[in-house]
Amino acid sequence: VRTVSRALGCTVNDVLMASAVGALRSYLMDLGEDIEGLTIRATVPVNLRPLEHAKKLGNHFGLVYLDLPIGEANPLRRLERVAQSMRELKQSRQAIVGFGLLAALGMGPAMLQRPALEMFSRKATAVATNVPGPQMPLYLAGARVADLMFWVPQNGSIGMGISILSYDGNVHFGLMTDARRVPDPGEIIKRFAPEFEKLLLITLME
């Protein structure tokens, strides 16, 4: 993954997110859906914690809306669009504003929290996050931890959660969906690795 990100001038997160977009595109195409020009909006957390506080417990992030270019057929162009969107979002104040709104909601009455969260959730189809895990094996009571995985929390009417985790040199892609919208998430998951391999092949050919 780092080979692709360095060669193409983007982040590891951009590469993994573009691979997820490719997997969604492939799935929808096999269903016969019209995806010409289609974008899916995902809520993505952006870390706002300063580096000097990296080891402190707790969360310190803002939420931004990322448009996933499902309709883009070219894998390289798809990655470029994801990377450009992420750069623009990181340079904007959207994450800081989102953090402030979430903090204010947390201090407000419960009767306002639910409708407010529902309003935010209507603006997105999915929530997606990539968590960089430890790149060396962990041990618990002397036993090696073979794999790690997490499931991104969802709220309101959002029907898809995209989870990406790196651990001990491997990348794990998970998907949690509303069965009424995506009854077979495994069909999307199995497309993730081939989509990444397309980007890797493009990188090696250049």
Where are these regions (language model features)?
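Hydrophobic "lid/gating" helix adjacent to the active-site nucleophile
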Residues: 7-52
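Flexible, Gly/Pro-enriched loop and linker segments at secondary-structure and domain junctions
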Residues: 121-163
